[in-house]
From Swiss-Prot:
A single MF term (Gene Ontology): CDP-diacylglycerol-glycerol-3-phosphate 3-phosphatidyltransferase activity
Purpose of the protein: Catalyzes the conversion of cytidine diphosphate diacylglycerol (CDP-DG) and glycerol 3-phosphate into phosphatidylglycerol. Essential for the synthesis of anionic phospholipids, thereby playing a role in balancing the ratio of zwitterionic and anionic phospholipids, which is thought to be important for normal membrane function.
UniProt KW keywords: Cell inner membrane, Cell membrane, Lipid biosynthesis, Lipid metabolism, Membrane, Phospholipid biosynthesis, Phospholipid metabolism, Transferase, Transmembrane, Transmembrane helix
Periplasmic side: 38-60, 108-145
Designated name of the protein: CDP-diacylglycerol--glycerol-3-phosphate 3-phosphatidyltransferase
Species per Swiss-Prot/TrEMBL record: Sodalis glossinidius (strain morsitans)
Length: 182
């Protein structure tokens, strides 16, 4: 198997996950900024790998498999770290909700693909808005330089949680006939 640049970017994102986790735990004042910057770098590769794969017509089965896995693991790890830092139900609840949604929708997409109806649960615009709010929340909450930035991050986390539910229900509604078919 020959790896192309988009796939290398996805692999780079996977490799970055333990580095931003490690940076989170470093006992230095600059550690939160370092953690957030590594997360941003990894998140940018998420946009870039897909863009390049489509632009250069280099989509592969391996890339199509690995990209969403890398995204989900990266976001789940960041949510776990944020929940651990704040150590409160009002952060853990939206974080856990988002992780649960990712698992549910990933399973739904896999199942819909098995029955030949993957396009019924393709990524929607609301899913893209949710991802944007989620990334804003995670970057600010991993960085958290002051109460204002943390407040913006918490607000974005709740916006992302609401959009998480909205998009999940959209996907489930789109698949309802297949899910509840006799």
């Amino acid at each position: 198997m020959q790896l192309n640049i988009p796939t290398w970017l996805t692999l780079f994102r996977v490799v970055m996950i333990p580095f931003f986790v490690l940076a989170f735990y470093l006992p230095f004042k600059w550690a939160p900024l370092c953690c957030a910057l590594i997360f941003v770098l990894a998140a940018v590769t998420d946009w870039f790998d897909g863009f390049l794969a489509r632009r250069w017509k280099q989509t592969t089965r391996f890339g199509a498999f690995l990209d969403p896995v890398a995204d989900k693991v990266m976001v789940a790890m960041a949510l776990v770290l944020v929940a651990e830092h704040f150590h409160s139900w009002w952060i853990t609840l939206p974080a856990a909700t988002m992780i649960a949604r990712e698992i549910i929708i990933s399973a739904l997409r896999e199942w819909m693909a098995e029955i030949g109806k993957r396009s019924s649960v393709a990524v929607s615009w609301i899913g893209k808005v949710k991802t944007t709010a989620q990334m804003l929340a995670l970057v600010t909450l991993l960085w958290r330089p002051d109460d204002i930035v943390s407040g913006i991050g918490i607000a974005a986390l709740y916006v992302a949680a609401v959009l998480t539910f909205w998009s999940m229900f959209q996907y489930l509604y789109a698949a309802r006939h297949d899910l509840f078919e006799h």
